[in-house]
Regions:
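Fungal secretory targeting signals
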Residues: 1-27, 202-228
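Beta-sandwich strand segments
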Residues: 115-128, 174-180, 199
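Short strand-edge motifs at loop-to-beta-strand transitions and within beta-strands
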Residues: 89-93
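C-terminal GPI-anchoring signal of eukaryotic secretory precursors
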Residues: 172-180, 184, 188-213
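Internal, hydrophobic beta-strand segments that form the core of beta-sheet-rich folds
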Residues: 100-120
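Short beta-strand elements
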Residues: 118-157
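Solvent-exposed serine/threonine-rich low-complexity stretches and specific carbohydrate-binding patches
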Residues: 74-87
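Short, solvent-exposed loop/linker segments at the N-terminal edge
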Residues: 32-40
């Protein structure tokens, strides 16, 4: 039941990502190239007027990493800053090296939300830039266009670990709804629990090596458990 609820949320998330935004597109300034594991102070202007209807529905925005797996469309895959005050225009962002393959074409995505709400409202995207210094490999699930990692729940510091969960437990498309799918979902949730930042903002770059080490350990533990 928990897995079915999770899959329904992912489907709803995917459909929402495909809808055009009804708000003014934010101005997001990105460096080119964008270095992995480096702390950036990004300028993000939501351009919401003081009397905008948006303010009745939202008082913050979430910042995501958006990827484009080969052969598929672009969409948010993990969050970089969970809650940013709607009028804040400078956001500290670090993209972990294991979040995407090297030389990936990436975007930064934002979405409005009420503080404390688990899910956001619609998505806007920056222009593209290239991620350098990264070391991830596309999982088969991503290449199949069937990733079950929820960008609202999984931070980019837990995303590499969650990708390992998918690689460990999903070997065929027929395994998504049975016991293996349940194990994969539990593994992904554990990654988020252990590696998501405790605060609403981005993690300071000085702690990145420690976080990556923990991600490797968690992924290894689940990999061993999967073959026992």
């Amino acid at each position: 039941m928990e897995l079915k609820s999770f899959l329904l949320r992912v489907i709803a998330f995917t459909l929402l990502a495909a809808l055009p935004t009804v708000n003014a597109t934010p101005a997001i300034s990105l460096p080119y190239p964008f270095e992995a594991d480096k702390l950036y102070d990004l300028k993000i202007e939501q351009r919401i007027g003081p009397d905008s209807e948006v303010r009745k529905r939202a008082n913050a925005y979430r910042v995501y990493l958006a990827l484009t797996p080969p052969g598929w469309g672009t969409g948010p895959v993990c969050w970089l800053a969970k809650e940013v005050d709607i009028d804040v225009t400078q956001v500290n962002i670090t993209i972990p090296a294991d979040a995407a393959p090297n030389q990936s074409r990436i975007r930064i995505s934002t979405a409005f939300l009420k503080k404390g709400a688990p899910r956001s409202m619609g998505f806007s995207y920056s222009s593209r830039t290239t991620l350098v210094g990264a070391n991830a490999t596309w999982s088969q699930k991503e290449l199949d266009g069937r990733s079950h990692i929820d960008a609202e729940e999984v931070s980019c510091w837990a995303f590499g670990c969650a990708r390992t969960c998918q690689e460990t437990y999903y070997t065929t498309k027929d395994e998504e709804d049975g016991p293996i799918g349940t194990k994969a979902y539990a593994c992904i949730k554990q990654c988020a629990k252990d590696l998501n930042p405790r605060s609403n903002g981005a993690i300071n770059g000085m702690h990145m090596s420690r976080i990556l080490a923990v991600a490797v350990i968690i992924g290894f533990i689940h990999m061993v458990a999967g073959v026992l």
